[in-house]
Design a protein with these regions (language model features):
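A long, amphipathic alpha-helix that forms part
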Residues: 89-100, 126-166, 177
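Membrane-interface soluble catalytic domains
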Residues: 38, 55, 154-160, 183-186, ...
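Short glycine/proline-rich turn/loop motifs
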Residues: 15-18, 128-133, 201-205
Length: 212
């Protein structure tokens, strides 16, 4: 468990991808000195940002580091409208097309995950907890995210050299109870988020464990 960079995507993602350690980081973000995509390119990585979030909700891309992203795909490139989100699973075929055995890759799969309205992008078979109440609907989205993580992880495990690092976290949390649900509040559920870091390379895993 870790802390999100902020309570809302518009602040959290620019802060996260620029390693902002505290509030009022706009000057650091603007400089790009600590931008993850820029740093990845400096180390010879090809960079990817594949997003399931509607294009008109991602005006923050310049702050995330758009000019250092080699491959940017949003729902509009896959036939969705400018204001349409798409199911997270649509990111998986894009990931599968990347030849992970050729070159170095810094890949971000930006999911919708557990946003309201909970379950709106799920198929009927994904609603394993039913839809009797808001908690059940929210839990369905968590289950779907778990499945997606498993799919990506299993794909990485097929790589013969074992030279990869998997990272998963969330840009913010959700406060979900039977009688109320929201985000952006000061409730701990709004800023406590999961963090998963795994590499089959023992040295990389040890470094990750020491850092986090």
């Amino acid at each position: 468990q870790s802390y999100s960079a902020a309570l809302m995507t518009a602040v959290s993602l620019p802060s996260f991808f620029n390693a902002i350690p505290h509030a009022n980081g706009y000057e650091q973000i603007s400089s790009g000195d600590t931008n993850m995509f820029r740093l990845a390119k400096e180390q010879g990585y090809e960079t990817y940002f594949y997003s399931a979030q509607a294009e008109n909700e991602m005006a923050i891309l310049n702050l995330i580091g758009k000019k250092w992203i080699d491959h940017l795909i949003q729902p509009t490139q896959l036939g969705y409208g400018n204001g349409d989100n798409m199911p997270d699973e649509k990111l998986l075929p894009l990931f599968d097309k990347i030849n992970l055995q050729q070159g170095k890759h810094f890949i971000v799969l930006h999911q919708r995950g557990s946003h309201v309205p909970y379950g709106a992008l799920l198929q009927p078979q994904d609603k394993v907890f039913g839809e009797a109440n808001i908690v059940d609907k929210y839990d369905n989205t968590i289950h779907k995210t778990d499945q997606m993580i498993q799919t990506v992880f299993e794909q990485l495990q097929k790589q013969p050299d074992g030279n990869w690092l998997f990272a998963y976290t969330s840009d913010h949390g959700q406060y979900v109870r039977q009688d109320t649900y929201n985000q952006g509040t000061v409730q701990p559920d709004s800023y406590l988020v999961p963090l998963v870091l795994y590499s089959p390379d023992k040295a990389v895993q040890q470094a990750a464990n020491q850092a986090f």
